Regions:
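Walker A/P-loop NTP-binding motif of AAA+ ATPase domains
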Residues: 1-113, 124-127, 200-398, 403
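N-terminal accessory nucleic-acid engagement/regulatory domains that precede
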Residues: 116-120, 124-166
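Conserved ASCE P-loop NTPase core motifs with emphasis on AAA+ ATPases
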Residues: 127, 169-200
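Short conserved motifs of the RecA-like P-loop NTPase core
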Residues: 136-147, 160, 194-198, 306-308, ...
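AAA+ ATPase "lid" subdomain C-terminal helix
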Residues: 149-174, 398-444
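Short, mixed-charge aromatic SLiMs
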Residues: 181-187, 241, 433-443
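Non-catalytic, charged low-complexity extensions flanking SF2 helicase motor domains
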Residues: 420, 425-483
Length: 483
């Protein structure tokens, strides 16, 4: 980036100086040895002195490298001198401060214009690839350019060199996998790359939701070229319902069906005790997700993301500012990023989040009905004991009334342990005995689940084809659920 800046500046400035706290201040492009380290205050004094000595036709540029490390100390003398430099009346010199992306400047110099240039320009990237292999086809250059997007110049050079060293060629899949690892490491644990080794057929039931997702799959701009340019890219959904009903499993299944990455936002690492660090973490996480597109952004337990959002006196307004950043992200053009937000308490979400336009729909994922439990048993049998035939056993369907999909699977696994200990084959009676001893959450949290179900009647679309209400005609349509 420094070399690129010098290349552009050489057309406008007569002298270009570089500075860092290790090597001092020196004239760029000269062969003489760099000077000994110079104190930042002394360096700023030299810049101020230079302004009064240069001739009217001379212009100097000072590039301060890694200067964000110096600004962290909030030295009042240093900040005051920088402020004096910004208030020059005769602009014979200019100063460029280089630091990490999303640098927050102290208030006294906050009026300095900021430009985030974290990624390499596409034309520069094509030149770099052509220099490695002059005979590379144009379509391969385009694919490799997409595979390297979101990286800095040095990171691109490293991945290209690694591909050539290991495979003796520029391999798109290898570079894409390495790029994903680099971006996730850059996020410092704020996001997590999850496995997406199943598809929508691996999840039992929820046919209405799966049909809705399949209709929008071909319009996901990160996945395939668009023929209908007027149809916008799907933005995302909010899923609510009792725990264990498949909200999280569907995220992995959708990523597998759409053949894109599944990225989980780790809100446990997001919040920090340092002032401004939480907002910075959220910004870094969301920008990294954009760089990883096409992908599905999974925000699990969404209700825990904004606890007590209305009371800003308890946290100094951190949660309110975080909400503002997230709203800006949801409202912006984010083609190639599908947000999958799951929550057990839809009522506790801020109303701004649920406004139409930020998500495509709100779905209520209820406990599986009889037909869905049949599908779940078929999937579990094929997964664990394909040689056993328990299909169509009405007693099992009766015994699992009120069970979630996760509870059915756990009871199934418990039965396998019982059979392994007695060296017997899994049968209907073993499963029934295990199910009888199992206490589902629908019994433990009956009041909470009933309350959530009734609350969602006129506020969400049902993920299953059949609704568990006899008085469906009384249901008022939810404007957002009809989209």
């Amino acid at each position: 980036m420094v070399e690129r800046c010098i290349e552009i500046a050489s057309k406008r400035f007569t002298d270009i100086y570089r500075y860092n706290i290790s090597e001092g201040l020196w004239l760029a492009g000269k062969k003489q040895t760099k000077k000994t380290p110079v104190d930042p205050l002394e360096m700023l004094d030299r810049i101020l002195a230079t302004e009064h000595k240069v001739k009217y036709f001379e212009r100097s540029l000072f590039i301060l490298e890694h200067f964000d490390l110096v600004l962290e100390n909030q030295d009042p003398y240093l900040l005051t001198k920088l402020k004096l430099i910004t208030e020059w009346r005769c602009h014979h010199s200019a100063v460029v401060i280089m630091g990490r992306p999303y640098l927050e400047l102290p208030e006294i110099i906050s009026d300095i214009p900021k430009l985030n240039v974290a990624h390499i320009d596409e034309n520069d990237l094509k030149e770099m690839l052509s220099a490695c292999d002059p005979h590379i086809p144009e379509d391969e250059i385009r694919d490799l350019t997409d595979a390297l997007k979101g990286l800095s110049i040095l990171e691109c050079q490293n991945l290209i060199s690694l591909s050539l060293a290991k495979l003796k060629r520029l391999d798109k899949d290898f570079i894409t996998n390495q790029r994903t690892s680099v971006l996730c490491e850059r996020a410092n644990g704020l996001i997590e790359l999850c496995e997406a080794d199943i598809d929508l057929n691996s999840v039992g039931g929820l046919e209405a939701l799966k049909t809705w997702l399949l209709k929008r799959g071909r319009f996901f701009k990160g996945r395939s070229p668009q023929t209908e340019s007027r149809v916008p890219c799907p933005k995302g959904v909010i899923l609510t319902g009792p725990p264990g009903c498949g909200k999280s499993a569907l995220a992995s299944a959708l990523a597998g069906s759409w053949q894109v990455k599944l990225v989980k936002l780790n809100h446990a690492c997001l919040f920090s005790s340092l002032v401004g660090q939480t907002e910075r973490n959220l910004t870094i996480a969301l920008e990294t997700v954009k760089a990883l597109s096409p992908c599905i952004l999974w925000i699990d337990e969404f209700e825990k993301f904004f606890p007590q959002i209305g009371d800003s006196t308890l946290d100094g307004g951190v949660l309110s500012r975080s909400l503002g950043l997230l709203l800006e992200f949801l409202q912006s053009a984010r083609d190639g990023v599908f947000v999958w937000a799951t929550t057990n308490r839809l009522q506790s979400l801020p109303q701004e989040i649920m406004r139409a336009g930020r998500f495509d729909a709100i779905f209520f994922v209820d406990l599986p009905n009889r037909g869905e439990r049949t599908s779940i048993f078929e999937i579990l049998l094929g997964k664990y004991v394909p040689e056993v035939d328990l299909k169509g056993r009405e007693s099992l369907l009766d015994a699992t009334e009120g069970f979630s999909g996760a509870e059915i699977e756990q009871a199934f696994i418990d039965s396998l342990y019982e059979c392994a200990e007695s060296e017997a084959e899994l049968d209907e009676f073993t499963l029934l005995r295990t199910l009888k001893a199992f206490i589902p959450l629908s019994r433990t949290l009956k009041e909470d689940i009933d309350s959530l179900r009734k609350w969602c009647v006129s506020r969400a679309r049902f993920a299953s084809c059949s609704e568990p209400f006899k008085d469906r005609e009384r249901r008022e349509p939810c404007p957002m659920s009809q989209r």
